[in-house]
Amino acid sequence: MSATSPQSWMLPAVVEFSPLSGVDLPLSLRTLLRRRGFGEKAAEEIMTPPPLPDPSHHFPDLAAAVARVCQACERGDALAVCGDYDADGMTSTALLVRALLPLGALAEPAIPSRMDEGYGLNVAMVERLHAQGIRLLITVDNGVAATEALERAQSLAMDVIVTDHHTIPAIRPPMTALLHPATTPTDSPYRGLAGVGLAYVLAMSVAERLQQPKAIQVARDLFCIGTVADMAPLTGANRRWLLEGLTTLHRSHCEGLLALQRLAGIGDSPLSAEDIGFQLAPRINAVGRLGDPVLVVELLTETDRGKAMALARRCDDLNRQRRDLCDAIEAEAVALVEADGEGQVPPFLLLAQSHWHHGVIGIVAARLMERYHRPVALLAGDGDGRLRASARSPQGFAVDEALTSCADLLDRFGGHPAAGGFTVAAEHVHALHERLNGLAEPWLLQQGCNRPIRPEVCLGLKEINWDLWKGLNALAPFGMGNRSPLFWSRGCVVEDWRVLNGGHLALTVGQDDTQRRAIAWRTAPLEPMPPSVDIAYELAVNEWRGERRLQLMLKAVRAHQPEVTLTCGERRYQARILPIKDAGIEPITFEVINSTGESLRASLDQQAPVHCSDERSEHPQVRALLEEASIALGLRP
C-alpha cells in the first residue's frame, strides 16, 4: 500500500437520509450497508446468519461420495487424500486425514511438490498410489480438470471422489462423485465454498452417517484457516461456520494450530479473520511456496504438543525465508523499473529474472500492482529455456482474458480476472510483453494512472469510539465478499507525524478536541506534510502492554482543500461550507457554485435531510447535486 501515491478519490453514493432504521447499528454503519445494497432483512442476516439447509439437498453427488467413504471406513480400507500446495489444499488434506482415521479408514496424504511435480493430481501419482494398494482417491482443492489422471484411475479400477472449486471442463472427466459449488443451486449458501469447505461438508456428512461426531471436532478449526487463507467469500455457509469457529479457535484441540498461535503471539483471546489472514495463513502458505507441503499436514495432524511445536518452528523459519525473499525480489524489481526513469512504466509491467523463486513471485507481483496500479507479471526461470510467471491485476482489467488473447505465445496458462499464471518460452517473452501492453494500454488510458480510492462512509473523529467498534464487529468477519469498510475523515489537523523503523508513516490527527492515531505501512510522508489532510482508513485495535486503543490504518492521505469540485456530466461545480457568521443561520450551511458563478445555498444538521428553500432545488438533478455536495464536504456519512 502506498498511501501517498497519486490518487483519484471516488465519492460514495447518495442514499436515503436515515437508511435501514430498523437495524440496531450506528447511522454510519447502516449507511455503509445500504450503499452495499443491503435491505433490512439482509442486514440482519449478515449479523445473524440463518440456519443452513441439509447439504445433501444441494450437492447431487454427496450421497454417493458419503456411501463410498463410509464403506472404506467400515472395511478399514486404505485411501489417499490428494491435495495441493496452497493453504486451502493443505488444510483440506489435513482435515480429511484427521477426520477419517478415527472413523476407520487408513487415510494418507498425497500432495505433489510445487517445484518437482506441479499442480494437482497427475498420472504418476495415480500409478504410484495404485501400486501401494490404494483403490480410493479423494481429491481436495484440485482434480476436476485432471482428465488424464482421472482416466488412468478409471483404467486401474480406482474410485475417485473429486472435491474441487475450480472451473469444471466442458467435458467432465470420469469420476465416482463430484462435490463442487457449481453443482449446487445458484442461490445455495454452499456456492462460495473453497476446497476446505467441500472437505468439511464431506467429513461432516460421513461422521453424521457413522454417528461419530467427535471425529470432526478439529475439522471446523481447519475449515476456518483454509477458508480465510484461500480468500473465499465470507458469505453463506462460509460466514456461518466461520462465525461459529472463530469463537473457539484459540482453544483448538489441534496442537499444530495452538503451536502456530503461540509462535505468532496470539491465542490468548478469540481470534479474528485478520489473525488468520496475517498471522497463521502466511506461516502455512510459506511451506507450500518454499518447502514440502506434507510438513503442514504433519503439523495439523500431530497430537503431541512438543512435536507440534517443533513442526511449527519449521513453518515459522520458512515464513521468515519467504519474507526475506519477497523483500529482496521486490527491491530488485523496483530498481529495474526505476532504472528506466520516472514515467516510463509500461501499461503492463512484465519483469523477468531467472534466479527469482517461483514460490513467491505472486506475492511480489501483488505488491508491484499496488505500487504502480497496473497489471503485473513476474517471470522466473523454469529450465529448458522457459519461464514460469505469476500475474496480478487491478480491478477492471481481466488478466485471465488477456492471457487467453496470448494463448498462441504460451505453453500453458490459467487464472481468473485478478490473478493468473503461465509458462512461456524465453524467445516469446518480448512478443508477449508487446501484446500485453497493447491490451492494457486502452484500459489504463480510460482508468488513469492514479490509484482509485473508494471510501464508503465519512466519519468525524469523535464518532470513532468503542460503540462504533462494537457495531463494526457485528458485521465481521471481513474478507472477500464482505470487505473491511473503508472510512474517510475530512479536514483533519496533522498534530504530529513521524517515520517509524521499516518505513511506516505514523500520524496523530485531530478534529476539534478529538485526537486519533493513524499508521500507514510501508509509506513515505507527503512532502511537505500539509497542516490539514483528508484520510481514508480502516479501523483496528492496537494492543500494547495491556492497553487497547482504536487505531486508523491509513490507505490514503491527501492535502485538505476547503472547496470540493463536483461533476455532473460535463458540468463542474464548486462546493464549500459557509462560516456560520456569514450564513447568519444555524445549522451548517453550504454553497454550490456553477461555472458561471451562480450559487445555491442549503443547510442541514444531523437530525434532518438537506434543506433548501430555493425552488431550483426541487429539480431532481439539483437535489441530487446538493446531496452529493453534503457527502463530499463531510457533512453526511
Where are the language model's segments positioned?
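Conserved phosphate-handling catalytic cores of large alpha/beta enzymes
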Residues: 129-132, 139, 145-232, 403
